[in-house]
């Protein structure tokens, strides 16, 4: 209706000026207690609600490598991309320990996308810090990118607006090339918090925030955007091949 349209218009202006905030659609005028409750509301245990419950395997018809996919809410297309590169996959829940992951003898470890504040996952961050010492190639996407950064001593921050949509431009500082990427996140790794073992590789061309990191003391890298996007731009699909190349160099 026209009235509903006006409501959305007013809220859009408010968000534009003040940034992302909690909201509630109601036909009643809320009292002060309801407003305070809304201000304090936050998503909790987001990853626990979207991860798989038990480990499972997806064999490749022409297996060349074995990859453990640590599932924080993995998109199906991550599985498809790895499978297309002849990777046998073992998908494990977010609660899996580093020791358990290593018991699968993976050639590579994939850290999936997922929801929520990365700092809400201290147990995962702790386990991931152990995996970084294993020498096994690691590739992180979205939340996986943020968790890998935190495990190496970097910091993250909540963005005022977040990055949403299938047309987010990023620059590869290694090659100088620009790419159009698909993104959907409200947190970012802080550029100035990267440790000495990390190199900023990708930046967002709209606001300069971190979009990807390469690590110098172990074979690992990560990106904030979604190279597996479907539908969406396929510009950065080559990152899956880079991951497989890391695996093959270690073999």
Q: Which ranges hold each PLM region?
A:
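A glycine-centered loop/beta-turn motif at secondary-structure junctions
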Residues: 212-250
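Flexible inter-domain linker/hinge segments
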Residues: 13-66
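Residues that mark the start of a beta-strand
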Residues: 64-68, 88, 137, 180
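Redox- and metal-dependent alpha/beta enzyme cores, enriched for Fe-S-associated oxidoreductases
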Residues: 78-80, 94-104, 111, 139, ...
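Short helix-loop-beta junction
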Residues: 76-91
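Catalytic beta-strand/loop cores that center a nucleophilic Ser/Cys/Thr
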Residues: 176-218
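Cysteine-nucleophile active-site neighborhood
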Residues: 108, 112-188, 232-247
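Short, small-residue-biased leader/transition segments that mark boundaries at the very start
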Residues: 1-8
């Amino acid at each position: 209706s026209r009235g509903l349209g006006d409501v959305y218009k007013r809220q859009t202006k408010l968000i534009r000026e003040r940034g992302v905030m909690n909201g509630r659609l109601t036909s009643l005028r809320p009292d002060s207690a309801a407003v305070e409750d809304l201000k304090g509301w936050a998503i909790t245990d987001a990853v626990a609600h979207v991860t798989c419950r038990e480990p499972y395997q997806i064999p490749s018809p022409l297996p060349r490598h074995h990859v453990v996919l640590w599932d924080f809410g993995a998109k199906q297309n991550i599985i498809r991309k790895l499978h297309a590169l002849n990777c046998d996959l073992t998908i494990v829940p977010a609660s899996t320990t580093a020791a358990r992951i290593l018991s699968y003898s993976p050639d590579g470890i994939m850290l999936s996308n997922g929801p929520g504040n990365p700092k809400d996952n201290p147990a995962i961050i702790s386990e991931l810090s152990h995996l970084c010492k294993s020498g096994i190639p690691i590739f992180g996407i979205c939340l996986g990118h943020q968790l890998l950064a935190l495990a190496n001593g970097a910091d993250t921050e909540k963005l005022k607006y977040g990055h949403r949509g299938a047309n987010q431009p990023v620059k590869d500082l290694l090659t100088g090339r620009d790419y159009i990427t698909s993104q959907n996140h409200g947190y970012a790794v802080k550029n100035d918090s990267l440790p000495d073992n990390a190199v900023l590789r990708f930046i967002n061309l709209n606001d300069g925030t971190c979009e990807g990191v390469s690590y110098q003391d172990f074979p690992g890298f990560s990106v904030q955007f979604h190279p597996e996007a479907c539908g969406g731009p396929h510009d950065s699909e080559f990152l899956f091949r880079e991951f497989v190349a890391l695996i093959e160099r270690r073999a």
